[in-house]
Amino acid sequence: MLTATRGPYLLVVQQDDSPFNPREDDNFGKMVCFHRQYSLGDHHNYIDKDDFLRDLYLKTVGDDERGAHRYERALDLMNYKIKAPFGSPDYERQVDERLMKVISQKYLMLPLYLYDHSGITMNTTGFSCPWDSGQVGWIYASKEDALREF
């Protein structure tokens, strides 16, 4: 516990033994994050980012056999159109961008970045230090929910 006084005022700073999680209090967007050390964002059952993007893609085009076929066909076409080496970070980025172009028809999404250096900080615009930071997920909401809410 820390204390400070100035004139008639007394400031007391002490540990909060039962802090609340701000993600448990009426959130509009859902945070889906993937990190090997930290449990970030909201609970989800996605295996990885590809599983997450596939799910939102199918929710956009139709979560049925036809939608699954469209998804597979889109990936096949990307293999021919993307010039970066298959599996490279540049290739993965381009695949994600193309999937999100379709997903953006029904969803609003922002990337989530983490800076990990003597504590962690998150934002949606990225950090200038690529060594200690990178994208860890997305925060998203459906356009339908946004229109209903606002």
State where each predicted segment sits.
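Acidic interaction surfaces
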Residues: 1-150
